[in-house]
Amino acid sequence: MAMYGGQIHLIIGPMFAGKSTELIRLVKRYQIARYKCLVVNYEKDARYGNGVRTHDNTCISAVPTASLDDVESISEHVEVIGIDEGQFFPNIVSFCERMANAGKVLIVAALDGTFQRKPFTNICELIPLAENVTKLNAVCMYCYKDASFSKRLGNETEIEIIGGSDKYKSVCRKCYFF
């Protein structure tokens, strides 16, 4: 089935905002419309096995990889590419631009900021290339207001620490500083 043109749809926000849920929802819509879809997830995120799984247990099968270069040949045979945990792929900008220019639809779910509220640079670079950017909020796990930030519970300083509610909380601006 021929696509009407390539595009990049970026879904950003803190942890527990529903980014993976939205990614799965959009990919399933394309599947219902009989588009060939590929979903990719970050290889080091082995919390849920082979697949993208939301915190409420919704799942879609996915190809695990550490580098988007590894799925480029598979990508030639699909029309829609979903990428979860996009912030962990260093070459996501060049990959998405190349694939969108080849007529493919890219749906990328990613954190926009680190636990230190610093930007994931590669995701920020993707924003001006995207046709659609959706910024989701979570619920603050302390005061239950809108949460725009991810707060790490441990004292680790490295950026890439894979985890769920055991390691992170979604928080509002006020509760970030508690």
Curated annotation (Swiss-Prot):
A molecular-function term among this protein's GO annotations: thymidine kinase activity
Keyword Nuclease carried by entry: no
Residue numbers binding Zn(2+): C140, C143, C172, C175
Coiled-coil residues: none
Active site residues per record: E85
Keyword Kinase: yes
GO biological process: DNA biosynthetic process; thymidine metabolic process
Protein name (record): Thymidine kinase
Chain residues that bind substrate: F115, I159, E160, I161, I162, G163
Similarity-based family: Belongs to the thymidine kinase family.
One protein family per Pfam: TK
Organism field: Myxoma virus (strain Uriarra) (MYXV)
Keywords associated with the record: ATP-binding, DNA synthesis, Kinase, Metal-binding, Nucleotide-binding, Transferase, Zinc
Residues that coordinate or bind ATP: G13, P14, M15, F16, A17, G18, K19, S20
Swiss-Prot/TrEMBL catalytic activity: thymidine + ATP = dTMP + ADP + H(+)
Entry EC no(s): 2.7.1.21
Alphabetized SUPFAM superfamilies for the sequence: Glucocorticoid receptor-like (DNA-binding domain) (SSF57716), P-loop containing nucleoside triphosphate hydrolases (SSF52540)
